[in-house]
């Protein structure tokens, strides 16, 4: 369920939904206040100088707005936007075709930039630093290199795994920002904004309930809103009420902390199969039947943020919060945490 709620949309209808609700200006972007305030200054200064904006790196968990910010940057700069991802750029030739198609002031957005191959990454260095690339013509003894000048452009890179970026690539980004999880209050505002755009009536309490269970992530909040709309429509109601919101969340097995079935499997595996840890990520992944990359990128950041698991040099461990919520005991206790007569 979490992958479904977090994945970047590929279905045409889902893409249309994302485009419909996506803000096009920084002033309409909710959250990440310091980041957007700084970007506003950097963009204005670059436009006044008539220069390309320095290359921008966004890092952080999925669903927080990295792609949306790339769209906004292109819009604010008045340039075009080309979108690709690290896994798609498997050969330097693929990157060269993209780079040579860019016009002055355009933005190139590379999602999952940490997944670039070393050959493609090295090819990107001269493009980022000097706006040029070297094309190899022919092969063997007759091979020769031709240098092509590129129009000044801005590269926006996005990653959920900043630690996997090489130092040379990271150093070439003049602007680097990490996106943080959103507060429930901000998510509530986003839900109400999306509902207004889509023509959905929703109670304030219902919006708050969905916001609190959205894992601090706008993409999840918006998709849960869509599911609540479905339940409301089938119930032949004109308004998403608190009762219908809770019914939706219960059907999706999302609890009051925003945890879904896989989150619970991860925590219970830590507690029951590994005695609370520490345990390596590969062993934990095998125990729950999930890829370790997915656990690291999708599930683990929120579980750490909310204090249910912790990372140590020896592996992942369950926290007191996990013991309390799932077992009703604290580490080392012999009995239930809440017994009769306890104060």
UniProtKB/Swiss-Prot annotation:
- Catalysed reaction, written as an equation: ATP + H2O = ADP + phosphate + H(+)
Question: Which residues take part in binding DNA?
Answer: 311, 316
| Region: Large ATPase domain (RuvB-L), residue numbers | 1-182
Tell me the InterPro entries matching this sequence: AAA+_ATPase, AAA_lid_4, DNA_helicase_Holl-junc_RuvB, P-loop_NTPase, RuvB-like_N, RuvB_C, WH-like_DNA-bd_sf, WH_DNA-bd_sf
Q: Which GO terms describe its biological process?
A: DNA recombination; DNA repair
Query: Where is this protein found?
Result: Cytoplasm
Domain of life where this protein originates: Bacteria
Q: Where is this region: Head domain (RuvB-H)?
A: 256-343
Q: What is its EC number?
A: 3.6.4.-
Residues binding Mg(2+), per UniProt = 67
Instruction: Locate the residues binding ATP.
Output: 21-22, 63, 66-68, 129-131, 172, 182, 219
Q: Which UniProt keywords apply?
A: ATP-binding, Cytoplasm, DNA damage, DNA recombination, DNA repair, DNA-binding, Hydrolase, Nucleotide-binding
Q: Which NCBIfam families match?
A: PRK00080.1 (NF000868), ruvB (TIGR00635)
Q: Give a short account of what the protein does.
A: The RuvA-RuvB-RuvC complex processes Holliday junction (HJ) DNA during genetic recombination and DNA repair, while the RuvA-RuvB complex plays an important role in the rescue of blocked DNA replication forks via replication fork reversal (RFR). RuvA specifically binds to HJ cruciform DNA, conferring on it an open structure. The RuvB hexamer acts as an ATP-dependent pump, pulling dsDNA into and through the RuvAB complex. RuvB forms 2 homohexamers on either side of HJ DNA bound by 1 or 2 RuvA tetramers; 4 subunits per hexamer contact DNA at a time.
Q: What's said on domains?
A: Has 3 domains, the large (RuvB-L) and small ATPase (RuvB-S) domains and the C-terminal head (RuvB-H) domain. The head domain binds DNA, while the ATPase domains jointly bind ATP, ADP or are empty depending on the state of the subunit in the translocation cycle. During a single DNA translocation step the structure of each domain remains the same, but their relative positions change.
Family label: Belongs to the RuvB family.
Protein name according to UniProt: Holliday junction branch migration complex subunit RuvB
């Amino acid at each position: 369920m979490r992958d479904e709620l977090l994945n970047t949309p590929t279905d045409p209808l889902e893409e249309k939904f994302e485009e419909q609700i996506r803000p096009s200006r920084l002033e309409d972007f909710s959250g990440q206040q310091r980041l957007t305030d700084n970007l506003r200054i950097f963009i204005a200064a670059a436009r006044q100088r008539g220069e390309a904006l320095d290359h921008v790196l966004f890092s952080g968990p999925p669903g927080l707005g990295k792609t949306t910010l790339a769209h906004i940057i292109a819009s604010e700069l008045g340039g075009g936007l080309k979108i690709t991802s690290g896994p798609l750029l498997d050969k330097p030739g693929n990157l060269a075709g993209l780079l040579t198609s860019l016009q002055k002031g355009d933005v190139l957005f590379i999602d999952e930039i940490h997944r670039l191959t070393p050959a493609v990454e090295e090819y990107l260095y001269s493009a980022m630093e000097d706006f040029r690339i070297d094309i190899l013509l022919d092969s063997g003894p007759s091979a020769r290199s031709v240098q092509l000048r590129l129009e000044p452009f801005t590269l926006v890179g996005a990653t959920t795994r900043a630690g996997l970026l090489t130092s040379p690539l990271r150093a070439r980004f003049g602007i680097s920002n990490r996106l943080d999880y959103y507060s429930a209050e901000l998510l509530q505002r986003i839900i109400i904004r999306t509902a207004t755009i889509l023509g959905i009536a929703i109670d304030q309490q219902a919006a708050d309930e969905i916001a609190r269970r959205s894992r601090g992530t706008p993409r999840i909040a918006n998709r849960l809103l869509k599911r609540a709309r479905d339940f409301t429509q089938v119930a032949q109601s004109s308004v998403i009420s608190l009762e219908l919101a809770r019914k939706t969340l219960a059907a999706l097995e999302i609890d009051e902390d925003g945890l879904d079935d896989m989150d619970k499997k991860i925590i219970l595996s830590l507690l029951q199969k590994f005695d609370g840890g520490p345990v390596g990520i590969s062993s934990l992944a095998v125990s729950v039947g999930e890829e370790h990359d997915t656990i690291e990128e999708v599930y683990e950041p929120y579980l750490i943020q909310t204090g249910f698991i912790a990372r140590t040099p020896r592996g992942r461990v369950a926290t007191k919060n996990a013991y309390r919520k799932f077992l009703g005991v604290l580490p080392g206790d012999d009995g239930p945490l809440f017994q009769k007569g306890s104060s």
